[in-house]
A protein has these predicted regions:
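S-adenosyl-L-methionine-dependent nucleic acid methyltransferase catalytic domains
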Residues: 1-15
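Intrinsic low-complexity, intrinsically disordered segments enriched in polar/basic residues
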Residues: 2-6, 48, 90
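Class I S-adenosyl-L-methionine
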Residues: 7, 65-75, 82-195
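Intrinsically disordered, low-complexity coil segments
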Residues: 8-12, 49-55, 94-99
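Residue-level preference for short coil/turn positions at secondary-structure junctions
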Residues: 12, 31, 53, 69-72, ...
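SAM cofactor-binding core of SAM-dependent methyltransferases
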Residues: 16-66
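Short His-Asn-centered micro-motif
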Residues: 19, 38-39, 60, 78-79, ...
Length: 195
């Protein structure tokens, strides 16, 4: 494991690759960084860009960008699509049974073997036993990383999907730091899709 807890506190800006960037909720608290964000969906990428005008936003395939550009960065954050891992896959009222998305596991294995910098991969707790043991469990999220992450409090917004009310959605957007008046559920996805 790397000892990189002070990566963002050094004198120079940290070059960050934000994969599957979505609307940018994960990006809210990052400081002293130079960020390149990769988002597949142009409409979502535009919202990210509006909320983070100093970041470079790439509309494209996060997996391909990672393979080609990983060594240009000090730190990589990845939040691969969660929908096909989520417990909601089994809890839904509709018949949406599908295979889980292997991108999550591919990114973790790829970064473990082909990236020398620091990295974090985040996703929801899956409906199945994780294929790779996470380093941390934070609320409804699992974290994989190649460095120790200090424990911290993380708010856990409950029932924002199952209740589906405007009030719960607004609490969710506020928690994520998303400034967007539109529907965050776009093309069957919330926040980000390929990601």
């Amino acid at each position: 494991m790397n000892d990189n807890n002070n990566l963002f506190e050094r004198g120079q800006k940290t070059k960050v690759l934000n994969l599957f960037a979505g609307l940018g909720g994960n990006r809210l608290k990052w400081q002293n960084v130079e960020v390149t964000a990769v988002e597949f969906e142009p409409k979502i990428a535009k919202v990210y860009e509006d909320n983070n005008p100093n970041d470079t936003v790439i509309v494209g395939d996060a997996m391909e960008y990672l393979k080609k550009h990983r060594n240009e960065f000090d730190f990589i954050w990845a939040s691969p699509p969660c929908q096909k891992h989520s417990k909601m896959m089994k809890a839904t009222r509709h018949d949406v049974a599908d295979f889980f998305d292997l991108q999550l596991w591919q990114v973790i294995i790829f970064l473990s073997h082909f990236f020398d910098g620091s990295w974090v991969v985040e996703n929801v707790k899956p409906y199945y036993e994780p294929l790779i043991k996470p380093q941390k469990e934070l609320g409804r999220h699992l974290i994989w990383s190649n460095f120790d992450i200090t424990d911290f409090e993380m708010p856990n917004i409950k029932n924002f999907i199952t209740q589906g009310t405007t009030k719960e959605t607004e609490k969710f957007k506020e928690w994520l730091g998303i400034k967007y008046e539109g529907n965050i559920y776009y093309k069957g996805n919330h926040c980000h899709k390929n990601y």
